């Protein structure tokens, strides 16, 4: 081994000499001393790797962990040295680059006074050569580190591989040493959930896992609860407790359980501190003020009690019942709570500190609630608390049982003992629980804020419907006078789109007008029709009788009721086409306006407008100024028009006659 080491040293020294010559020929000032040093150290280090197996075989008695620690330390040192060397080389490169850049800028500024072409040429000449030179000069320092691994690459790779394997093995050993338990947690709904808990997890971490699994509200009252059925005791896990350590104290065949429950008394002191610090004043006034204490005073009281130089323990003292060792008898004694433990007043002594006797200290005990102590141990009441060492899992004389008179006293003593035992840690646990609950509430609020509020489609839809149904498109004023019949007629018009069914009860009149134009006489002009729209229907029957004697060629002026318009053929030849749209618009007002005086018929020869059916029918029924020449048609119309809203068989007969006359007329005209 010695000879091989010397040969390698000679080779490495010759290599370094050649590198020095190269650097001198290039005229670059590198730092030779730092460059050769790291590889030599690495080389010596690799030699140590070769001797590692021999040393391990020779020194089997030595501790493997100590050797591994030394090995890891050597590796880390070598890595740090290589990193430092690389940093130094990079710094040198940066310096060279800055110097060259400054030189280039100086030359460029000096030649700026010359012509533009000369400036460009000089700039290119000065700027272009440096870039190729920079990489060459910059690459020279890095090469020294790579050559040694090339020469000793196999050995170094083997050594590094071994070191990495050892590191992984150590990490796996550490991970394997971590205690892990599968815990079955009982829920308040009698269901269970299994969790994998390791010794690095605290009760707070387990609670967070349960919050994620159960999706509960994450308030501060949720806690892990420990129950001992054999001893009939139970307690709350503190958030800072190690769950695995506590469960490791259980026996293998134990019936103990871990529950996930809400307990309001867990942090009751932080919600109402006055009930624990100011409740034992002995005056009713103080109790009343305690009940009315505001949030600021509560916060001030908590800061004074938990955030000072020392923790203030509630001043609790009073008579409690103590269970005698190995017996079911209880003795009443006067106990006092102090930060170090519980003290009692011996018989015949006073409450002074020198006369007090120590009952128990809180360092190595946990506090539990008693379950059915009155039945099992003949306790005076069921309000009992128990103090025992966590490793005691069966009945023992070292378990202390104390009984209180009421539940309020019990809660005060239990909370006071917890404050004396855990101190400010208890307050820190509460603050973390509040922060966790606040975070959960914010997440839930973010999920609920984006939900759309339900709209009121009924009101909106009703408004839209009324808005569309009330106006008739062309005569909105007829809405109030028409009433429900008009709305029904309008809905029929929208759905069926039939002109004849424009109005519910007056649809037959519209059909009559469509069929009455069979008469060869021309209808009155459009203005007369509009005036007739306003005329009333009751005056029609008296005027209808008059025109019965009139001849066809000369219609009388007083004859209003007879059929108004001629056949559709004559309507097509009519000179006034605009009236058709107004009749539809003027249909509603036919019911309301009074009948105006009949207008004189001047344009008897003019043809009537083509599409007046709904409005014209009502106009004719309301005394149209120009009556038709047919004497037989008016009496039929008088019967039906005298009561426009009353349907009957006469209307059907009249309609059939009109249809027949219209068919004949159409057949004769072509």
From Swiss-Prot:
Annotated stretches, region: Disordered: 449-653
Sites bearing Phosphoserine, chain numbering: 55, 532, 537
Membrane topology: Peripheral membrane protein
Main location: membrane
UniProt key word Phosphoprotein: yes
Assembly information from the UniProt record: Interacts, through the N-terminal Pro-rich region, with the WW domain of APBB1. Interacts with RAP1A, PFN1, VASP and ENAH.
Localization, UniProt: Cell membrane; Cell projection, Lamellipodium; Cell junction, Focal adhesion; Cytoplasm, Cytoskeleton
Role according to the record: Appears to function in the signal transduction from Ras activation to actin cytoskeletal remodeling. Suppresses insulin-induced promoter activities through AP1 and SRE. Mediates Rap1-induced adhesion.
Entry superkingdom: Eukaryota
SUPFAM superfamilies in UniProt: PH domain-like, Ubiquitin-like
Residues bearing PTM Phosphothreonine: 534
Organism: Mus musculus
Residue ranges annotated for the Ras-associating domain, each copy included: 179-266
Compositionally biased spans, kind Pro residues: 553-567, 576-599, 606-615, 625-634
Database matches in InterPro entries: GRB/APBB1IP, PH-like_dom_sf, PH_APBB1IP, PH_domain, RA_dom, Ubiquitin-like_domsf
Keyword Cytoplasm on entry: yes
Protein family (similarity comment): Belongs to the MRL family.
Protein name, as recorded: Amyloid beta A4 precursor protein-binding family B member 1-interacting protein
One GO CC term on file: cytosol
Start-end of Polar residues biased regions: 456-475
GO biological process: positive regulation of cell adhesion; signal transduction; T cell activation via T cell receptor contact with antigen bound to MHC molecule on antigen presenting cell
Record keywords: Cell junction, Cell membrane, Cell projection, Cytoplasm, Cytoskeleton, Membrane, Phosphoprotein
Tissue: Ubiquitously expressed with high expression in the hematopoietic system.
Annotated PH domain residues: 313-422
PROSITE patterns: PH_DOMAIN, RA
């Amino acid at each position: 081994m010695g000879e091989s080491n010397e040969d390698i040293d000679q080779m490495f020294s010759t290599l370094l000499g050649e590198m020095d010559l190269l650097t001198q020929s290039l005229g670059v000032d590198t730092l030779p001393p730092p460059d050769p040093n790291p590889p030599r150290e690495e080389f010596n280090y690799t030699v140590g790797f070769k001797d590692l197996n021999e040393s391990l075989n020779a020194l089997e008695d030595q501790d493997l962990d100590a050797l591994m620690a030394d090995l890891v330390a050597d590796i880390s040192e070598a890595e740090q040295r290589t990193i430092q060397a690389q940093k130094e080389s990079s710094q040198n490169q940066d310096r060279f680059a800055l110097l060259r850049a400054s030189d280039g800028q100086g030359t460029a500024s000096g030649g700026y006074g010359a012509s533009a072409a000369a400036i460009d040429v000089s700039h290119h000449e000065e700027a272009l050569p440096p870039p190729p030179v920079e990489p060459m000069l910059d690459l020279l320092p890095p090469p020294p580190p790579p050559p040694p691994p090339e020469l000793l690459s196999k050995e170094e790779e083997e050594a590094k591989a071994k070191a990495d394997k050892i590191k992984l093995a150590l990490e796996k050993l550490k991970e394997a040493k971590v205690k892990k338990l599968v815990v079955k947690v009982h829920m308040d709904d009698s269901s269970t959930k299994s969790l994998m808990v390791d010794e690095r997890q605290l009760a707070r971490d387990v609670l967070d896992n349960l919050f994620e699994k159960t999706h509960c509200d994450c308030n501060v009252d949720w806690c892990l609860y420990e129950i001992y059925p054999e001893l009939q005791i139970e307690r709350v896990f503190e958030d800072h407790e190690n769950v695995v350590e506590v469960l490791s104290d259980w026996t293998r065949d134990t019936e103990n359980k871990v529950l996930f429950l809400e307990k309001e008394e867990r942090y009751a002191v932080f919600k109402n501190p006055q009930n624990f610090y100011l409740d034992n004043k002995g005056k009713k006034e103080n109790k009343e003020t305690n009940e009315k204490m505001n949030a600021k005073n509560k916060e001030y009281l908590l800061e004074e009690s938990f955030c000072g130089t020392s923790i203030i323990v509630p001043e609790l003292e009073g008579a409690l019942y103590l269970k005698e060792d190995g017996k079911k008898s209880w003795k009443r004694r006067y106990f006092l709570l102090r930060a170090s433990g519980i003290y009692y007043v011996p018989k015949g002594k006073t409450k002074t500190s020198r006369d007090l006797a120590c009952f128990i200290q809180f360092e190595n005990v946990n506090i539990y609630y008693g379950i059915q102590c009155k039945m099992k141990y003949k306790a005076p009441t069921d309000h009992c608390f128990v103090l025992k060492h966590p490793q005691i899992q069966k009945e023992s004389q070292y378990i202390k049982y104390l009984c209180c008179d009421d539940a309020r006293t019990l809660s005060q003593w239990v909370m006071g003992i917890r404050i004396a035992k855990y101190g400010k840690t208890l307050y820190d646990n509460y603050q973390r629980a509040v922060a966790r609950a606040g975070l959960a509430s914010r997440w839930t609020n973010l999920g609920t804020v984006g939900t759309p509020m339900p709209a009121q489609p009924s009101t909106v839809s009703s408004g839209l419907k009324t808005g569309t149904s009330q106006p008739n498109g062309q005569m909105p004023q007829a809405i109030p006078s028409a009433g429900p019949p008009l709305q029904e007629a309008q809905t029929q018009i929208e759905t069926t789109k039939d002109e004849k069914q424009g109005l519910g009860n007056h649809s037959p009149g519209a059909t009559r007008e469509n069929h009455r134009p069979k008469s060869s006489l021309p209808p009155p002009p459009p203005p007369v029709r509009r005036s007739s729209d306003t005329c009333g229907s009751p005056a029609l029957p008296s005027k209808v009788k008059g025109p019965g004697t009139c001849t066809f060629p000369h219609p009388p002026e007083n004859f209003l009721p007879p059929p108004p318009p001629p056949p559709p053929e004559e309507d097509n030849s009519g000179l006034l086409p605009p009236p058709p749209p107004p009749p539809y618009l003027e249909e509603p007002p036919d019911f309301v306006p009074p009948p105006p005086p009949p207008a004189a018929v001047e344009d008897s020869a003019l043809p009537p407008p083509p599409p007046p059916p709904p409005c014209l029918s009502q106009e004719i029924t309301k005394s149209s100024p120009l009556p038709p020449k047919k004497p037989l048609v008016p009496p039929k119309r008088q019967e039906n028009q005298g009561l426009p809203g009353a349907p009957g068989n006469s209307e059907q007969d009249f309609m059939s006659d009109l249809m027949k006359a219209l068919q004949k007329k159409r057949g004769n005209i072509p």
